[in-house]
Swiss-Prot record:
Catalyzes the attachment of serine to tRNA(Ser). Is also able to aminoacylate tRNA(Sec) with serine, to form the misacylated tRNA L-seryl-tRNA(Sec), which will be further converted into selenocysteinyl-tRNA(Sec). Pfam families: Seryl_tRNA_N, tRNA-synt_2b. It comes from Vibrio campbellii (strain ATCC BAA-1116). L-serine binds at residues 242-244, 296, 396. This is Serine--tRNA ligase. The gene is serS. The keyword Protein biosynthesis applies. Homodimer. The tRNA molecule binds across the dimer.
C-alpha cells in the first residue's frame, strides 16, 4: 500500500499521479478524515497533558497533608482517563477508516511509464527472433496435442470441468522438462535459490502481496467441511494464484541485513485462478486455465537497486525464450494496464503462429515498497539503527503451459511431429521429436 504520509502531505500531487492510471482518488473524503484525525489527535494530546500535569499535584497535596485535595485530584484524573479512552477509540475508528481507504489505492506509476488506458496503449521496446514461415497448413496446439494423444481436454472436463487439462506421455514429459530447464537456468546461471513453498496460503499472505482485500473473487478459497478438527477451528486457506504470494511473504515481518540483499528466489508451482473476468476469452486450449504451472522469479532489493533489478529480472525471463529459440517481443505496460501493486511492468509476448500474434508469456514488475509496507519487510543498513522498507520484484520465468503452446506451434513439422528444442533434449532422454 502507499505511504499514508503521501495522502497527508502530498494529497493533490498523489491524486494527479494516480489519475495517470485512471484511478480517481477521493480527495474530499481523505481531507475530511484527515481533519477529523488531526482534531481528535489534538484532543487526545491535550487530555494526556492535562492528566500528567494534574497527576503531579497528588504528591504535592499528600506532602502538605491535604488528603481530601489529593482524593479530589484522583477523581479528576479518573474522569480525564475515561474521556481520554473515549477519544482514543474515536481516533482508532478514524484511523481504521483511513487505513481501509488506503488499501483500495493502487501503486503510483513510475514517471517513465507511458500514459494509456489499456493494452492497446502499451509500448513495444524490442523484438527477438523472426517468426518462421511454413509451407504446410498450420495446426494449433490443441489439434497437435490431440492428434498426438498427449493433450486430453475431454478427460479433464469429466474429472473437473472446463479450463483444465490432462497431459499424457511425451507431452507430460515435455511439460516437466520445460519447468526443470527453467529452474536449472535460473539457479545455475542467474543466481536464484530454488524454493519449495505451500500451495495453500492464509489471508495475511494474500494481503501482503496485494491480492486481498481487492481481488478475492479471482481466487479459489477452501471451505471447511467440518466445524472443528481435534478441537481446533478449521483454517480458511486459499490456493495460490502465483508463487509470488508464498515466496515474497518469506520476508514478511523480517529485517534483513544490508549485506544479504538482494535476495533472489525462484519456485515452480501450480497456480490457481478463477478467471472471473475472462468469460468467453481463450476458451480453447492451454492459454487461459484455472490450473497452470509457472516458474516464478522474486527479488528483494534495496530501494536504490530495484529499477536495475527489474531490467535484470526481465532479462532472465528473456534468456529462457532465447535459449528455446522462440520469437518474442518486449513491451512496457502503460499506466492503465499495469497491475494494482506495480510501479513499472514489462511484458514478454511470445509468437503464437496459429493465432498469428504475440501472446503474453511473462509479466515482470517492480512493486517498489508497495508490498513491503503491507508485509513490514525491512532491512537495516550497516551502521544504522532504523530499518527501511525493502523493494520487491517478481516475474514469470516463465509460464510453463504457454511456453509449451509456443514450442508445439512454432516447432511443428509437416508430418505433425514436434521438434524438441535443443536445450530440452537432455530432459527428454535425448529425444529430438515428439510424435
Amino acid at each position: 500500500m502507499l505511504d499514508s504520509k503521501l495522502l497527508r502531505t502530498e494529497l493533490d500531487e498523489t491524486a494527479a499521479k494516480l489519475a495517470r492510471r485512471g484511478f480517481k482518488l477521493d480527495v474530499e473524503t481523505i481531507r475530511k478524515l484527515e481533519e477529523q484525525r488531526k482534531s481528535i489527535q489534538v484532543e487526545v494530546e491535550n487530555l494526556q497533558s492535562t492528566r500528567n500535569s494534574i497527576s503531579k499535584q497528588i504528591g504535592q497535596k499528600m506532602a502538605a497533608g491535604d488528603k481530601e485535595g489529593a482524593e479530589e485530584i484522583k477523581k479528576q484524573i479518573g474522569t480525564l482517563g475515561s474521556d481520554l479512552d473515549a477519544k482514543k477509540v474515536e481516533l482508532e475508528q478514524v484511523m481504521a477508516q483511513l487505513d481501509e481507504f488506503t488499501l483500495s489505492v493502487p501503486n503510483i506509476p513510475d514517471d517513465e511509464v507511458p500514459d494509456g488506458k489499456d493494452e492497446n496503449d502499451n509500448v513495444e521496446i524490442s523484438r527477438w527472433g523472426e517468426p518462421k514461415t511454413y509451407d504446410f497448413e498450420l495446426k494449433d496446439h490443441v489439434d497437435l496435442g490431440e492428434m498426438g494423444g498427449g493433450l486430453d481436454f475431454a478427460s479433464a472436463v469429466k474429472i473437473t470441468g472446463a479450463r483444465f487439462i490432462v497431459m499424457k506421455g511425451q507431452f507430460a514429459r515435455l511439460h516437466r522438462a520445460i519447468a526443470q530447464f527453467m529452474l536449472d537456468l535460473h539457479t545455475e546461471e542467474h543466481g536464484y535459490t530454488e524454493m519449495y513453498v505451500p500451495y495453500l496460503v492464509n489471508s495475511d499472505s494474500l494481503f501482503g502481496t496485494g491480492q486481498l482485500p481487492k481481488f478475492g473473487k479471482d481466487l479459489f478459497h477452501t471451505e471447511p467441511l467440518v466445524e472443528k478438527v481435534n478441537d481446533e477451528e478449521p483454517r480458511k486457506l486459499s490456493l495460490i494464484p502465483t508463487a509470488e504470494v508464498p515466496v515474497t511473504n518469506l520476508v514478511r515481518d523480517t529485517i534483513s541485513d544490508e549485506a544479504d540483499l538482494p535476495i533472489k528466489m525462484t519456485a515452480h508451482t501450480p497456480c490457481f485462478r478463477s478467471e472471473a473476468g475472462s468469460y468467453g476469452r481463450d476458451t480453447r486450449g492451454l492459454i487461459r486455465m484455472h490450473q497452470f504451472d509457472k516458474v516464478e522469479l522474486v527479488q528483494i532489493t534495496k530501494p536504490e537497486d530495484s529499477m536495475n533489478a527489474l531490467e535484470e529480472l526481465t532479462g532472465h525471463a528473456e534468456k529462457v525464450l532465447q535459449l528455446l529459440e522462440l520469437p518474442y517481443r518486449k513491451v512496457v505496460l502503460c499506466t492503465g494496464d499495469m497491475g494494482f501493486g506495480a510501479r513499472k511492468t514489462y511484458d514478454l509476448e511470445v509468437w503464437v503462429p496459429a493465432q498469428e500474434t504475440y501472446r503474453e508469456i511473462s509479466s515482470c514488475s517492480n512493486m517498489w515498497d508497495f508490498q513491503a509496507r503491507r508485509m513490514q519487510a525491512r532491512f537495516r543498513r550497516k551502521g544504522e539503527k532504523k530499518p527501511e522498507l525493502v523493494h520487491t520484484l517478481n516475474g514469470s520465468g516463465l509460464a510453463v503451459g504457454r511456453t509449451m503452446v509456443a514450442i508445439l506451434e512454432n516447432n511443428q513439422e509437416a508430418d505433425g511431429r514436434i521438434a524438441i528444442p535443443t536445450v530440452l533434449q537432455k530432459y527428454m532422454a535425448g529425444a529430438t521429436h515428439i510424435g
